[in-house]
């Protein structure tokens, strides 16, 4: 299922052809109705959820391309001693992540961002986790951010060197008992990752 978050509100659909987002395809799709539904949902904050059901995945992809500017990002869930690394960013519980730079692959960007935001080095990717999607209004342009997530480990241990220029004030570890508290204090899009995180903790 495709889920796109706007703060605590969610757009969801059963079908989504993500590959079409990166293709300059001139194919004409009948996506105007979906575009209008998305825009109505974005500007009407009284709508908590927009469920597009079994909409054609290609039509939805073209609608997303029409409505949003794309800003891909990548991040990591770092496991240390059966705990995971979290950060406090602008007062919210978060995971280390950031924009993918030109020429970078998501995995390389994730390793770089985690090290920059936490100070943790010698990182190794174990496997890929589900991506999250959220959107926001920036300079009068709706932007969609797909964040590619990776499960990681390190042989150098925990460090607490927050990247303060990015609004990060704290780097800390959370065990399985602390997951519920993290979930209360984090973003709606990240809550979808919690089951995967729990599976990674013994």
Tell me what each language-model feature is.
Residues 99-190:
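Unchanged
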Residues 21, 28-29, 79-115, 120:
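Conserved Nudix-box catalytic region and its N-terminal flanking loop in Nudix hydrolases
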Residues 75, 83, 170:
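Conserved beta-strand and immediately adjacent loop positions that scaffold enzyme active sites
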Residues 32-75:
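Acidic, metal-coordinating catalytic segment for phosphate/diphosphate chemistry
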Residues 189-202:
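Charged phosphate-binding loop/patch that engages nucleotide di/tri-phosphates or the phosphate backbone
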Residues 78-81, 152-154:
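Active-site beta-strand termini and strand-to-loop segments that position acidic
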Residues 1-43:
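N-terminal leader/capping segments at the start of a protein or of a new domain
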Residues 1, 73, 145-149:
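Short hydrophobic/aromatic beta-strand or adjacent loop that forms the aromatic wall/cage
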């Amino acid at each position: 299922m495709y889920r796109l978050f706007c703060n605590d509100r969610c757009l969801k659909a059963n079908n989504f052809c993500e590959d079409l987002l990166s293709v300059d395809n001139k194919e004409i799709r009948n996506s105007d109705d979906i575009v209008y539904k998305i825009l109505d949902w974005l500007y009407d904050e009284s709508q908590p959820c927009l469920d597009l059901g079994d909409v054609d995945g290609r039509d939805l992809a073209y609608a997303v391309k029409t409505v949003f500017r794309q800003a891909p990002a990548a991040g990591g869930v770092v496991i240390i001693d059966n705990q995971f690394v979290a950060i406090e960013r602008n007062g919210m519980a978060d995971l280390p992540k950031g924009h993918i730079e030109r020429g970078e692959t998501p995995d390389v960007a994730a390793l770089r961002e985690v090290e920059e935001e936490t100070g943790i080095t010698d990182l190794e990717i174990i496997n890929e986790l589900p991506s999250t999607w959220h959107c926001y209004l920036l300079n009068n342009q709706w932007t969609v951010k797909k964040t590619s997530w990776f499960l990681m480990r390190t042989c150098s241990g925990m460090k607490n060197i927050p990247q303060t220029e990015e609004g990060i004030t704290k780097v800390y570890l959370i065990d399985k008992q602390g997951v519920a508290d993290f979930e209360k204090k984090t973003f709606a899009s990240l809550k979808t990752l919690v089951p995967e995180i729990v599976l990674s903790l013994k």
